Amino acid sequence: MRKVGVLAAACVAACAAGASGFKVQSGYLIAAEQKSNSIVAIDARQAGAPAWAWEWKASRDPGIAKGDAKLFNAPSDCKADGDSVLMIASCGNFAELSLATGLAVCYGHVGGNPHSITRLPGKGMFATASSVSHSVTIVSTADNPFSPELQPKKAYPLTSAHGVEWDAKRNCLWALGHTNLVRYAWSETQFELSAVRDYDFRPVGGGGGHDLAPDGAGGYFITTGKCLVHFDPNAGEFRLVERLKDIKAYSPNKTWGNAYTTVRTVWWTDRIIVKKGDEERVIGPYPGVKFYKARWMK
């Protein structure tokens, strides 16, 4: 009877989120929304403020222990990853979410005001970046997907760590700090990161590294306190793209345009800006909403 009850609760939670059968869709954004402490999907193919197409909240997910739900407050990043979404919150927790069910597949805890997450090769392996603890942390959820206290983890120092991205082409992890971008080698068998090279972007972008995003062609965009910078891993060179202040997230897309969130109040915004060539459209405004980051799903 208990198993039936849990399944029923899961179905109710998924239906409440409007998530049943939802899939990654072109032209949709996934966003971290800090007023409701939720992850939401938005149809961004046209300007305006449509209703959420999908939503996840830890407090409505029966797989999240009641005492752990508050550690998902202040979601700070989210990324579509196959049929899942990876999310992390400034209060310390992260999760892999199923788009189809609207429920967590696994979750864990890293602390230190985490700002970014990426999947590593290997079952249930993740890397995170935390700005207050100045660290990149690797975590395995494989054996204990819903028990953060039992999950092995290792932390590596990186000043004001804000971004992490796995590079499948080069088989390495990139991590963004306050003034530098670090390349790490990953060993699944040893559960170990090894720093390979450190790139200083201050001559081009100044300090304040905040967001790290793939450009879709093998390179990366970096946002700093004052500008948008492009990094070419093959040449090991940074290039100034545009002077944009306080960009929390930047997400390029050749079809739909380049989406970004920028500070309007404290560190939030009630809208997402999308630019394609000389054209600009606004997704929003949503009065009272507190977007932190937003990224294209596809």
How would you describe each model-predicted region?
Residues K66-K79, G111-R119, T159-E165, V204-D215, ...:
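Repeated scaffold domains used in trafficking and secretory/extracellular systems
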Residues W52-A69, L103-G108, P148-Y156, A195-P203, ...:
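A short beta-strand motif characteristic of beta-propeller blades
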Residues W56-V85, A89-G92, G102-S116:
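Blade-loop segments of beta-propeller domains
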Residues D43-A49, S140-F146, A185-L193, P233-F238:
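Short loop/turn segments immediately following beta-strands, especially the blade-tip
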Residues F22-Q46:
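An edge-strand/N-cap motif at the start of beta-rich repeat modules
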Residues A31-K35, L86-C91, A127-V132, L173-H178, ...:
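Conserved beta-strand positions in repeat-built beta-propeller and related beta-rich domains
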Residues Q25-G27, G82-S84, G122-G124, K169-N171, ...:
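Short coil/turn segments that connect the beta-strands within blades of beta-propeller domains
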Residues A10-G18:
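Hydrophobic h-region of N-terminal signal peptides that target proteins for export
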